[in-house]
Structure formats: C-alpha cells, structure tokens
Amino acid sequence: MYSIYHFFNSLVSKKASFGQVKKLVKFPFDNDLLSCRNDGQFPDMAIRVNKKKEIFTGGELIELKDSDSYVVSSFNSTIPTRKKDISKVITSDSSIIKQQMEKAGNGIYSLPFRDVFYLARGRKKGHTKVCLVNGSFFETISVDNLINKSFSQVLDERLKESGAEISGSVKDILSSIFSEQENFSKVRNVEKASVKLRFRIMTEVKAEGNILNSKKYPEIGDDTLNFVLPCDTEEDEKNIISKAKLVFGENTFNEFKIFKIKHHFNGYFLVFQLPLFD
C-alpha cells in the first residue's frame, strides 16, 4: 500500500536526518514507496500508484523545497498547485519520469490527476522546521487565474505608460489568452534571431503563504516535523484521522500533537506535529 501518509510515516522514522543532511535531496528517502525520483525536475519524487484505490490512491507528486532561512524557497519554472494532470508532467515518450514510472510497474494513466505535496525544510540560527504540505496551501487561487491577473497588471501598466486605450472586452480577451503556463514555457524561435527565447515563470511565496513564517504561523515551531493537510469540514477531519491511524499505528499516532491552523487566504489545515529531535 502506498500513499502520502505512508511517505510521511517513513520520514518520521528517520526524522533526525533532517538536521544532519546538508541538502534535502540527500535525505534517506524510502525508495520502495517511489515510482520516480529526480533532482531539479518536477516532480522530484512520485509515490507509487495503488492498483486498488478504495482507501489510498497513491500517486502523489512531491517537490522538495530547501532553504537556509524560514522562507519557502522560490519555485523555478513551476507554479505550486494542489493537483496536477499527469499528461502535463509527462510530455513525451522519452520523458525520464515516464521511463522511471514504467520501470516501477506503475499504471501511469490509471490516475490522471495527482495530488501535489511540497516537502519544505527551513533552517535558521541552528534550528530546523520541516513541513510536508499539500499544494493547496500555496494555490489559493487557480494557476490560470493567477497568470491571467498578473498579465492584466502588466497590460494596465503598459497602457498607462503609453497612453493607449483598448476596450474592456479586448483587454479581457488578451488576458484570457495569456493564462496558460505552458504558453510561457515553450522555446520561441524567431527568424534571423541568433538566440531562442523562453520565458520562465518564477513563483515566490508571500508571508501569508509561507508556512515557515514564525509570525504568520507560530504553531509551526522550531525543530518540528509537520504533516499539513487541508481540512475544511468535520468530514475532512474524520477522514484524515482515520487514514492516519491506519498508517501510523496507535503508538506513533498518539505521539503526534494534532491541531488546526487557519490559512490567511485559504481555510483550515490539520497539522500532525512531532519534535525533530528526541
């Protein structure tokens, strides 16, 4: 059985290593849980997909975020999201991710939409915080809407600077056209140009979306390991607790400090917390 819960449980058993490894990628992850593993390419890791998906589907995608401060490191060429279409991750038959998943015996397209998690480590003044956090903590509006509104700001600024005017309907059309992340990631080949141009999106977290920020989220203390899941209803909480008990076992489950935090933009999240060092 595979899932993000099983992955977090494997982190718990080796939690002291978070304070020892210089680079997060060097953490001794349990490769038996993984269908792929890469360095510097999204996803850094993926959980194996279960054949029987009644309780756990598996298949979660994980990106590592390592920082020498209590700020989640920037997202290069990606925008953090709660779910990802696997067909947009695997873009060709020669994809190393596809090859690794097939070698692992995974039915890649049996689970077309994958939950996304971020394993964030921050270090500051000899202390460490580690959070395995669902992507909804960062995706408080849709990716398309984020790009759309950002492009609209650029358009408004240029119109104001140039003194030009366009109708509201034309502006809306232009903004909607430039709302797909894939449009920016393609290499553009211009005739007679000696270079090719590719726009790269870089995403940085605001203080309100920075789970490592001690002022915004004081509950996430120094030297703690945290599992952070969206929890908007009592039913969500019951479901999360049920899965956690099933995977962690009674003894480990009872060691957790369990509480909710209120996201500044996006509802409540349930946190399972342990001290990093015994």
What are these regions (language model features)?
Residues 39-52, 59:
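Short acidic loop-to-beta-strand element that houses the catalytic metal-binding Asp/Glu
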Residues 2-7, 73-74, 129-131:
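A short acidic (Asp/Glu
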Residues 1-38, 81:
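Acidic-basic catalytic patches of nuclease active cores, encompassing PD-(D/E)XK
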Residues 125-278:
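Non-catalytic C-terminal interaction segments of nucleic acid-processing enzymes
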Residues 55-60, 65-129:
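Catalytic cores of nucleic-acid endonucleases
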Residues 36-38, 53, 109:
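Sterically constrained small-residue positions within well-ordered secondary structures
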Residues 12-21, 49-55, 106:
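Alpha-helix termini
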Residues 24-29, 36-44, 92-104:
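Short linear interaction motifs
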